[in-house]
């Protein structure tokens, strides 16, 4: 359903967000 797709997108987006935050901190 909708929540399943959102969960998949969220899981894929998390690593990108973390990498962006790490780059900003550096």
Curated annotation (Swiss-Prot):
GO molecular function: toxin activity
InterPro entries assigned to the protein according to its UniProt record, in alphabetical order: Antimicrobial_4 (IPR012523)
Recorded family membership: Belongs to the non-disulfide-bridged peptide (NDBP) superfamily. Medium-length antimicrobial peptide (group 3) family. Ponericin-W subfamily.
Tissue specificity remark: Expressed by the venom gland.
Subcellular location: Secreted; Target cell membrane
Record key words, sorted: Antibiotic, Antimicrobial, Cytolysis, Fungicide, Hemolysis, Membrane, Secreted, Target cell membrane, Target membrane, Toxin
GO biological process: defense response to bacterium; defense response to fungus; killing of cells of another organism
A GO CC term assigned to this protein in UniProt: extracellular region
Identification of the protein by name: M-poneritoxin-Ng1c
Described purpose of this protein according to its UniProt entry: Has a broad spectrum of activity against both Gram-positive and Gram-negative bacteria and S.cerevisiae. Has insecticidal and hemolytic activities. May act by disrupting the integrity of the bacterial cell membrane.
């Amino acid at each position: 359903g909708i929540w399943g797709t959102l969960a998949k997108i969220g899981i894929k987006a998390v690593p990108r967000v973390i990498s962006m935050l790490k780059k900003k901190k550096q």
